[in-house]
Curated annotation (Swiss-Prot):
Organism: Bothrops insularis (Golden lancehead)
InterPro entries on file: PLipase_A2, PLipase_A2_Asp_AS, PLipase_A2_dom, PLipase_A2_dom_sf, PLipase_A2_His_AS
Names of the cofactor(s): Ca(2+)
Top-level taxon in the UniProt lineage: Eukaryota
This protein's name: Acidic phospholipase A2 BITP01A
PANTHER family hit by this protein: PHOSPHOLIPASE A2 FAMILY MEMBER, PHOSPHOLIPASE A2, MEMBRANE ASSOCIATED
């Protein structure tokens, strides 16, 4: 029960339509991995400052930048449609804005999969106090 409560607290602080993005990540990576990317490095989780610490953290930086370019809908709350095809995701639906959110999430999930070998536990729960450098532009 305590683990469930901790996960609920962590889920509240993550940007995006968390449930969809989390399910997409788990599907693309082939296992339950969402918890590993909460508060990883300087960009995975809520917000982001400093320099990405590795390729995994850069996936989150690019995801944050992608969300920043979305206009006309809210990437933090709006739902979108997608289908699963052979370990990959195909974004669908008629709403171009929601499709853009889906593409941001799809690219990030694929980036995590492609860079899973760079994941380093020393960056999990890393903390913003370790990310004080100037942020690079998107």
């Amino acid at each position: 029960m305590r683990t469930l409560w901790i996960m609920a607290v962590l889920l509240v602080g993550v940007e995006g339509n968390l449930w969809q993005f989390g399910k997409m990540m788990n599907y693309v990576m082939g296992q339950s991995v969402v918890y590993k990317y909460f508060y990883y490095g300087c960009y995975c989780g809520w917000g982001g400052i400093g320099q990405p610490r590795d390729a995994t953290d850069r996936c989150c930086f690019v995801h944050d930048c992608c969300y920043g370019k979305v206009t006309g809908c809210d990437p933090k709350t709006d739902s979108y449609t997608y289908s699963k095809e052979n370990g990959d995701v195909v974004c669908g639906g008629d709403d171009p804005c929601k499709k853009q959110i889906c593409e941001c999430d799809r690219v990030a999930a694929t980036c995590f999969r492609d860079n899973k070998d760079t994941y380093d536990m020393k960056y999990w729960l890393y903390g913003a106090k370790n990310c004080q450098e100037e942020s690079e532009p998107c």
